[in-house]
Amino acid sequence: MIEINVYYKKWYSTIKKPKIFVKNVIKSSLINLNIYEYKPIISIVLANNILLQKLNYEYRNKNKPTNVLSFPYDKLNKKCNLGEIFLSLDTLIEESIDLNIPIEHHTCHMLIHGLLHILDYNHEEPLMQYIMESIEIKLLDKLGIRNPYVSRETIYP
């Protein structure tokens, strides 16, 4: 089950039908990762810089906003609560403008990035970063979105 909370109403004027958009990205990713049949519970909060900065400071001791934060809960099994993903629309818009890419594409990328974190992937070491980015590229390609790493440095929270 995918639970989506639109905390920041500006999402509605930026992404067409944001709840459906997010649900489709997560569902596609779970299917392509061959884990949709597990029916995991995933909570997604569509937020802003104010909330993400507060959470980033509280949980990571970084007093600045970020694009995505993930909070993993359970390991993958039937109907487990995988965790929460928080996205900041403000930061995603800024980054999309800087990268000259559609906000929808960057949002897909950061949703997938957050999903992989709650599935226990990380980018702390070069090999893990390579694995995680390779999966992101594959999942984005399934959505018709080009490789985000071709012409830029990696953006991580």
Swiss-Prot record:
Q: Where does it localize?
A: Cytoplasm
Q: Which cofactor does it need?
A: Zn(2+)
Q: What is its EC number?
A: 3.1.-.-
SUPFAM superfamilies (UniProt xref) = Metalloproteases ('zincins'), catalytic domain
Residues annotated as binding Zn(2+): H113, H117, H123
- Domain of life, per UniProt, equals Bacteria
Q: How is the cofactor bound?
A: Binds 1 zinc ion.
| GO annotations of cellular component type | cytoplasm
Which Pfam families does the entry link to?
A: YbeY
| An example Gene Ontology biological process | rRNA processing
Gene Ontology molecular function: any one: metalloendopeptidase activity
Matching InterPro entries: MetalPrtase_cat_dom_sf_prd, YbeY
Q: Is Transcription set as a keyword in this record?
A: no
Q: EC class of this enzyme? A: hydrolase
What does the UniProt keyword field contain? Cytoplasm, Endonuclease, Hydrolase, Metal-binding, Nuclease, Ribosome biogenesis, rRNA processing, Zinc
NCBIfam families in the cross-refs: rRNA maturation RNase YbeY (TIGR00043)
Q: What does this protein do?
A: Single strand-specific metallo-endoribonuclease involved in late-stage 70S ribosome quality control and in maturation of the 3' terminus of the 16S rRNA.
Q: Which family does it belong to?
A: Belongs to the endoribonuclease YbeY family.
Known PANTHER family for this protein? ENDORIBONUCLEASE YBEY, CHLOROPLASTIC
Specify the protein name.
Endoribonuclease YbeY
Q: Which organism is it from?
A: Ehrlichia ruminantium (strain Gardel)
